Amino acid sequence: MPRINIGLTDEQRQGVINLLNQDLADSYLLLVKTKKYHWDVVGPQFRSLHQLWEEHYEKLTENIDAIAERVRTLGGYPIGSMEGFLQLATLKEHAGDVPSATGMVANLVQDHEQLIRNLRDHVDRSGDEFQDQGTADFLTGLMEEHEEIAWMLRSFIEGQPIEPNGTQPATETKTPVGV
């Protein structure tokens, strides 16, 4: 790591860089999943979700670039391979799975909420453990963006029953008496 004199030790900077690289990995997996759902969504909400997810993956792309640049600002190198992303990410892929539109939304809510929990922890650790208030502030902004996205996605499926796997439960059709 190059010698940088910004009021943080090499150990503090490396600790924050490690956190940022995990956030970068999770953001990349979420970007890929969001794009995949953008391509695969079908049904009556196609246009709404297709457009919403385009906005989301464009924002994720901006955030990924900002995270990588923050790593470089601190003298580190951002991970940049799928192997590296998969090793560091806390989010999981759903390879070969094409859920319903509601299932896609539910999966993305879970992923954004996981990222929010991770970012909340990383904000605290950046500030308290590593004394890097700049990165803590940066991560707070990212966390707030994910909170808003999760809220929008949750609002889309609010009131709809959803199984833990993101599917809607089968419902019985009841024929009215006398029909």
Curated annotation (Swiss-Prot):
For this protein, the record's Pfam families field holds: Ferritin
Q: Which species is listed as the source?
A: Nostoc sp. (strain PCC 7120 / SAG 25.82 / UTEX 2576)
Taxonomic lineage from the root: Bacteria, Bacillati, Cyanobacteriota, Cyanophyceae, Nostocales
Source superkingdom: Bacteria
Cross-referenced PROSITE patterns, in alphabetical order? DPS_1, DPS_2
The UniProt similarity line reads: Belongs to the Dps family.
- All disulfide bonds of the chain are none
This chain belongs to which protein, by name? Uncharacterized low temperature-induced protein all0458
Task: Give the Gene Ontology MF terms in alphabetical order.
Answer: ferric iron binding; oxidoreductase activity, acting on metal ions
Q: Where is the composition biased (Polar residues)?
A: 165-179
Residue span of region Disordered: 160-179
InterPro entries from the entry?
Answer: DPS_DNA-bd (IPR002177), DPS_DNA-bd_CS (IPR023188), Ferritin-like (IPR012347), Ferritin-like_SF (IPR009078), Ferritin_DPS_dom (IPR008331)
Question: What residue ranges carry the coiled-coil annotation?
Answer: none
